[in-house]
Amino acid sequence: MNSFSTLKTLFCGSLLALSLVNTTQAGVSLDRTRIVLTGNENSASVNLKNTSPDIPFLAQSWVENENGQKISSPLVALPPLQRLDGAQKGVVRITKTAEVGLLPQDRESLFYLNVREIPPAPKQANVLQMAMQSRIKLFYRPSAIVPEKPGMVWQDQLVFKKQGNKFIVNNPTPYYITIISLSNKLNGEDSDKLTTFPGLMVAPKASLDIPVKTSNVNQFYMMYVNDYGGHPELKFVCQQDSCKVAPKDQQPKY
């Protein structure tokens, strides 16, 4: 193969790769990053949207348990398969089955909603297509622990214990709590963070080790995820080896 043919092949291959990248940017998107289904509700909904203006996609939906196993009870995603034409919107509804009564009633249970986009068959031969998949947390919250008011904060009940280069965080609440970061400063940069993980989740009524750059601090800010997918922060103050939430007048204003 001469130099011109080689360059032509490389150029065509680059164009094909770019077209594939652009194609995968379009697809099925979800309108939230988590779902909370309470015992007081029959179902919870997630809105879907085909972000491509002209390419139709199939959206396949299912629920997994906390171990990543596909299940059909006590929660089920309906419809399991739907077609979304270009720019069309759709809905996935999470519905309870009779077995929901077998779940713990004194704490949340964790599941995952999966939505996989299935593109149409390619018109050209030898074209690689990728089916993208979204996976978001799905919490079942029994009626007995539904907060009295929307937006109530329970993340302030966490207690951190210093132990070497780690914190042991205790979650006495019946809720899953997702911690994004611990930082020396409010809205801190990466250099201000005590943690290096992208986020971790503490189960209800459980403890978890959190590795930190240093535990030699008198205070820090905890960024967490609330029911709406927001990332507020709480200030914690330390006395000796124990760190608890700071008084309300020291908390960030939102």
UniProtKB/Swiss-Prot annotation:
Signal peptide: 1-26
A GO biological-process term: chaperone-mediated protein folding
InterPro entries attached to this UniProt entry: Ig-like_fold, PapD-like_sf, Periplasmic_pilus_chap, Pili_assmbl_chap_C_dom_sf, Pili_assmbl_chaperone_bac, Pili_assmbl_chaperone_C, Pili_assmbl_chaperone_CS, Pili_assmbl_chaperone_N
Keywords in alphabetical order: Chaperone, Fimbrium biogenesis, Immunoglobulin domain, Periplasm, Signal
Keyword Signal in annotation: yes
Location relative to the cell: Periplasm
Record-annotated disulphide pairs: none
Cellular compartments per GO CC: outer membrane-bounded periplasmic space
Domain of life: Bacteria
Pfam family name, one: PapD_N
UniProt xrefs under Gene3D superfamilies: Immunoglobulins (2.60.40.10)
Stored PANTHER family: FIMBRIAL CHAPARONE PROTEIN, PILUS ASSEMBLY CHAPERONE
Family: Belongs to the periplasmic pilus chaperone family.
Described purpose of this protein according to its UniProt entry: Involved in the biogenesis of the PMF fimbria.
Protein name, as recorded: Chaperone protein PmfD
Organism of provenance: Proteus mirabilis (strain HI4320)
Lineage per the UniProt record: Bacteria, Pseudomonadati, Pseudomonadota, Gammaproteobacteria, Enterobacterales
